[in-house]
Regions:
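C-terminal motif of bacterial Sec signal peptides marking the signal peptidase cleavage site
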Residues: 7-10
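Extracellular glycan-recognition regions
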Residues: 15, 20-293
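Sec-dependent N-terminal signal peptides
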Residues: 1-4
Length: 293
């Protein structure tokens, strides 16, 4: 089991120290570079053109002997050229565990995907907290979960992106309004910061959240989808009991993933990505989204 190094503080906030706008602590747009494709992380990328790509992804339920909460999962079958996933009634919140397929990668990583989340009969999911997207998780953190995610679908309302950091089993989510349809999601770690970004179809990239990162070097990077928080009823207060069985409910989510691409982001040592005066949203977007994307 890998342990968290240090402790998270000020989760979801930026630092208050303000460097001079022209001082050495400011990363300007012309000095920022887009993430690099290729290498070890590049080999983890896939466009989902072949069913054999399934072998690249590992189910969390298999590695950590959990309940398999995935109803349907295939590549280049239900939707040609795409990964397709239907979760059973499930959730990722605090100590609750849901579906997750992943690859283990080390170091600074940017994971970029194009996803579409719908209800089972089309349109937006009707059950609360029916969301799908990207997650990075500390392996083996069953008793005290540590993970970060960016997902889209229906949270407390339909048409939302949710950005969420969970430290030692305590989740801090934030919802942001988004248009329905295809959404580009990006989740990355660079240095001491995690970043979640999103882009509506035909729109511009936006920074969803920045968080301090003190998680281990090796993380699980992958895809999650969950649905139907309504059906947890009394189990909403008991993650241990909920995790021990498949909760019966009315799942209402199907997710299509067009591609998942992995890149290596990089920031100069003087840049403090937790400080918007050091690294503005505009600069962070350039540093944490693929060139030309």
């Amino acid at each position: 089991m890998l342990a968290v190094v240090g402790a998270l503080s000020g989760c979801g906030t930026t630092t208050t120290a303000q460097p001079s706008p022209t001082g050495p602590g400011v990363l300007t747009l012309d000095k920022a570079t887009a993430p690099e494709p290729g290498g070890e992380v590049g080999e983890a990328s896939t466009e989902f053109q072949n069913a054999t790509d399934m072998s690249m992804w590992t189910k969390l339920s298999e590695t950590e002997k959990d309940v398999d909460r995935i109803g349907k999962f295939d590549i280049n079958k239900t939707v040609k050229g795409s990964l397709y996933l239907e979760p059973r009634t499930s959730t990722w919140f605090d100590g609750f565990r849901g579906p997750y397929v992943y690859q283990e990668l080390a170091g600074d990583v940017l994971m970029y995907a194009r996803v579409k989340v719908e209800g089972m009969k089309g349109g937006q999911p009707k059950r609360k907290f029916s969301l799908g997207g990207l997650m990075a998780r500390q392996p083996g953190s069953y008793a005290k979960p540590n993970w970060v995610s960016v997902t889209t679908g229906t949270a407390d309302q339909s048409g939302q992106v949710e950005v969420k950091y969970t430290q030692d089993g305590s989740s801090k989510p934030q919802e942001l309004a988004v248009k329905t349809g295809w959404v580009d999601l990006a989740l990355g770690r660079v240095g001491r910061v995690f970043v979640a970004l999103y882009r509506e179809d035909g729109g511009k990239w936006k920074v969803g959240r920045r968080w301090p990162s003190n998680l281990p070097d090796v993380l699980q990077w992958g895809i999650t989808a969950y649905t139907d928080w309504d059906s947890y009823n009394l189990l909403k207060k008991d993650a241990t009991k909920a995790n021990a069985k498949q909760v019966k409910g009315v799942p209402d989510l199907k997710m299509t993933v067009d591609f998942v691409r992995f890149l290596r982001p990089e920031l100069p040592e003087y840049a403090d990505a937790l400080n918007t005066a050091s690294v503005s949203d505009e600069v962070l977007i350039k540093a944490m989204t693929p060139a030309g994307a």
